[in-house]
Swiss-Prot record:
UniProt modified residues of type Phosphoserine: 346, 480
Keyword terms, alphabetized: Phosphoprotein
Protein name (database record): GRB2-associated-binding protein 3
Span list, region Disordered: 295-339, 389-408, 418-463, 493-513
UniProt-listed InterPro entries: Gab1-4-like, PH-like_dom_sf, PH_domain
Bias kind Polar residues: ranges: 317-331, 454-463
Any one biological process term the GO annotation gives: macrophage differentiation
GN (gene name): Gab3
Record domain PH: where: 5-117
Length: 595
């Protein structure tokens, strides 16, 4: 947020949360009060660790808050009870803030309450006092546009009794006028439209944006039943109303009230149109000293609270013709036409009435062209003949009947050529549509060709590999496989070539050791072992699966071994092996028997 939104800043001592007021320390922080009303940001109270900190410690939202001076001990610590303490209470937390002096506390309380819209009375009185001493061209903000037109709601009669009641009503409304805030809250505003019995009033804007608004905010509206040259009554409106009033350039004047029932329909000023829709519901108070009301004024009605009408539809124009006597308020012998009028007229807007009067004819022609472009029913005939431009070779008339001058309507100032309201020409029966080459479509996507699965390799199932290991035992030895040193767990594994080589080397080493080392075993009767022969077969099946069918099977590389690591395998004679084992067992039995 910019520094221009800063309202007040200074050092304050901040309280901890309410449940920790007595236990936790009160910190001295740099507080900044920011108003975000003009920039669209919320009104906040920020506090920083010091002056030069860029990021605030906390941002307190003042959208729903109350502020007041602290009275009494309450929850305040003893060291701060005699100081200048004020309280800011929000929806989430209550802050006890300690100021250094009473003047600082007054400034903070007044600034926060002003931001939180708690000082409407003082602000309204100050704004009214400053408004009476400042000219209309030096008003500081568009907030003063809130003090625009104020119209009495009671009826004005000719006798003095009712006149006094009107003055009393105006005095009461003047007292209500002091309570208005500096700025207009748009959510409280209402837009309305004058009905046929209401009196249009000319608002005198008192803000410095009046001049620019009067020139740029002329909202064009289609109005039926208006006099083509109604601006003649706008140039000298005061001669018919018998209202004597000057137009000073410095002092802002009240609104000029137009009479609704002044002699003759030609003197009915601006009452023949629902004119001057004001975007603000509050209006300027009419002071009796500044404006002398005409004797023919019967009543002043406040604007209706009905929303603005929707844009007209084609059926709206025919219905408007029937309601024309209601809108105009009097019957006119002249042929009704279409004209354009601004929604609001101010003092600066009257300077442009002359140019606006000259543009009525061209604007009416432009609206006729717009109606033709929308194929709306035309209420008038083309009064102004236009010269038809030279027809181009590529120009195709929209209607088969009529000449080129009738087919080409009047061109407006912005070179807009509307369409003709006539029907389109009929096409010949033998006319065929142009051929369409669908292969030239830019976003057409061809289907991808089907996958060619002929070159893809399939999963080849290999036959199971069966390896049979036979572990024979001598009938005379009756040895268990544990005593023979055969590890059965190795038989169930799936060794590779290197592991098989290592296992065979280890088995040979174990066999050599078992010939030397003599183990002691308990004696078992030879009769019980003679009937046992231990022979088992172990079948191991291997199935090679290749799950990646597209890629070839990986080639297993054999490790190259040196001459020292290479082992030459020989076929083992089973008879010699059994003889060695039986000899070993006999030696063992003899040693055990000697012990």
């Amino acid at each position: 947020m910019s520094t221009g939104d800063t309202v007040c800043m200074g050092w304050l001592i901040k309280s901890p949360p309410e449940r920790k007021l007595q236990r936790y320390a009160w910190r001295k922080r740099w507080f900044v009060l920011r108003r975000g009303r003009m920039s669209g940001n919320p009104d906040v109270l920020e506090y920083y660790r010091n002056k030069h900190s860029n990021k605030p410690i906390r941002v307190i939202d003042l959208s729903e808050c109350t502020v007041w001076k602290h009275a009494g001990p309450g929850f305040i610590r003893k060291e701060f009870q005699k100081n200048f303490v004020f309280i800011v209470k929000t929806t989430s937390r209550t802050f006890y803030l300690v100021a250094k002096t009473e003047e600082e506390m007054q400034v903070w309380v007044h600034s926060i309450s002003q931001v939180c819209n708690f000082s409407h009375l003082e602000d309204g009185a100050d704004s009214m006092e400053s408004l009476s001493h400042m000219p209309s061209s030096f008003q500081p903000s568009p907030a003063s546009s809130l003090h625009t037109v104020h119209v009495a709601n009671s009826a004005l009669l000719k006798d003095d009794r009712n006149t006094n009641s009107v003055v009393t009503e105006e005095t009461r409304r003047e007292s209500e006028f002091l309570f208005l805030p500096d700025y207009l809250i748009l959510s409280n505003c209402e837009t309305g439209r004058l009905h046929h019995a209401s009196l249009p009033t000319r608002c005198d804007s008192w803000s410095n944006s009046n001049h620019s608004l009067a020139q740029t905010s002329f909202d064009d509206v289609f109005l039926d039943g208006l006099q083509p040259f109604i601006s003649n009554n706008l140039v000298h409106p005061l001669h018919h109303g018998k209202v004597s009033q000057d137009f000073p350039s410095i002092r802002p004047q009240a609104s000029l009230i137009w009479n609704r029932e002044i002699n003759g329909p030609s003197r009915n000023l601006m009452s023949s149109s629902p004119l001057l829709e004001s975007s603000l519901n509050p209006t300027v108070h009419v002071e009796e000293k500044q404006v002398s009301l005409p004797s023919g004024v019967k009543e002043l009605n406040i604007m209706s609270n009905t929303p603005p009408p929707r844009p007209p539809k084609p059926s709206y124009l025919s219905e408007q013709r029937q309601d024309q006597p209601l809108l105009t308020g009097h019957s006119s012998n002249k042929k009704p036409g279409y004209t354009m009028v601004p929604r609001r007229i101010s003092l600066s807007g009257l300077d442009h009435v002359g140019s606006w009067k000259g543009d009525v004819q061209s604007q009416s022609l432009r609206h006729r062209d717009k109606r033709l472009s929308l194929n709306l029913p035309c209420k008038f005939s083309p009064i102004y003949p236009t010269a038809s431009p030279s027809a181009e070779d590529s120009y195709v008339p929209m209607s088969p009947k009529g000449t080129a001058s009738e087919l080409r309507p009047h061109c407006s100032q912005d070179d807009y050529i509307p369409m003709s309201s006539s029907m389109l020409p009929e096409l010949p029966a033998d006319l065929e549509p142009p051929p369409v080459n669908r292969n030239l479509k830019p976003q057409r996507k061809s289907r991808p060709p089907p996958l060619d699965s002929r070159n893809l390799s399939t999963i080849q199932e290999h036959t199971s590999l069966t390896r049979t290991y036979t572990v024979p035992c001598n009938r005379t030895s009756f040895l268990s496989p544990q005593r023979n040193g055969i590890n059965c767990a190795r038989l169930f594994s799936t060794p590779s070539e290197e592991e098989e080589e290592e296992e065979e080397e280890e088995e040979e080493e174990e066999e050599e050791e078992k010939y030397i080392q003599m183990e002691e075993y308990g004696t078992v009767s030879s009769l019980s072992r003679s009937a046992l022969s231990w022979t088992k077969k172990f079948s191991l099946d291997y199935l090679a699966l290749d799950f990646n069918s597209t890629s070839p099977a990986p080639v297993q590389k054999k490790l190259l071994l040196s001459e020292e690591q290479r082992v030459d395998y020989v076929q083992v004679d089973e008879q010699k092996t059994q003889a060695l084992r039986s000899t070993k067992q006999e030696w063992t039995d003899e040693r055990q028997s000697k012990v």
